[in-house]
Amino acid sequence: DIYFGTAHRGRLTLLSTVLGMPYRGILSKFQGNSNDPNEVLGSGDVKYHLGVSSDREFDGKKIHLSLTPNPSHLEAVDPVVAGKVRAKQTILNDKTTDKVFGILIHGDAAMAGQGIVAETFAMSQLRGFRTGGTIHFVINNQIGFTTTPHYGRSAPYCTEIAKMVQAPIFHVNGDDPEAVVHVCRLAAEYRNLFKEDVVVDMFCYRRSGHNEADEPMFTQPLMYKKIKQHPTTLNLYKDQLVKEEVLSEEEAKTKISDFKKFLDNELILRKKNK
C-alpha cells in the first residue's frame, strides 16, 4: 500500500496518471456533479481537495494507492498520512515496513514555512510513530503565492528542515524528466533499504498564477517575463527525444494531437458521469 498526501498543485495530474481516475470523472467534478448528491448539504468542496483510492497494477504486481483528502491548510495532511501508514502497518503486522509506506508532496514555501512539517519530521524516528521512512517530494516552483524565497525563509534551500533527521536531499531539475525519474527511483531504493526519510527537491516554476484569479505579472513581472520566454518541459523533452532519434517530429506532434483529442472526448463524456 502507498498513501499519498499533497496540496493542490499537481493534484489532478496525480489523480489521473497515478491513481487512474478517469479524466471524465475529474471534469465532471468541475461541473458540480457528485457521486452521491445527498452526501453534502451545499455546493461541496474544491476539486483540489479530492481524495481517491484505487487498486493498480505495475510490473505485473497489484498495489493499493490512496490519496488522502486535505483542507486548504497546507501541510495539514502530513501527520495524517504518516498516521494512516503506521495504522496499516500495525493491522498487517508489517514489522519490516516493506508493505506500506507514505509519499508526501510539498510546495517549497509551505515546506519551509509550515511548522507542521518540522513536527512530522521530529516524530518520524520515534518508536511510537515511526513508519520506516517517508518519501518527501517538493514541487519547488520558487514562489509561494506572491512571496519569493528570499522573503519567505532564512535558509538557502526550502528542504533544510529535513536535515534534523539527517535525511538525504536530492535537488533535481524539473525540466529534465528522466533525471527526475532517476532520482525518484534512487529515493525509493534508499527508503526501502535504510527505512528512513528521504527528500527529492524538484526545481521548477509555476507557469500560470497561484490560482484562477491570480495574475503573476502584477507581482513578479521580471520573473514571469522570463517564464513566458522559457519553453515548456513538454517541448524541451520532445526536442530531446527528436534529437536522440527516439521519435520523429511528426510522431511527436501526432502523440500530442491525439492526447488533446482524447481530452476533448473526455470533456464530452463527462456529462454522462453524474
Name what the model sees in each region:
Residues Y157-I161, Q229-H230:
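A glycine-rich, aromatic-flanked flexible loop/lid motif
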Residues G144-A155, K163-V199, F203-G209, M217:
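Conserved phosphate-handling catalytic cores of large alpha/beta enzymes
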Residues D1-I116, F121-I135, N140-H150, S154, ...:
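Conserved internal helical-beta-strand scaffold that buttresses enzyme catalytic cores
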Residues E160, E189, D239:
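Surface-exposed charge patches
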Residues Q220-I227:
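A ubiquitous short alpha-helical element
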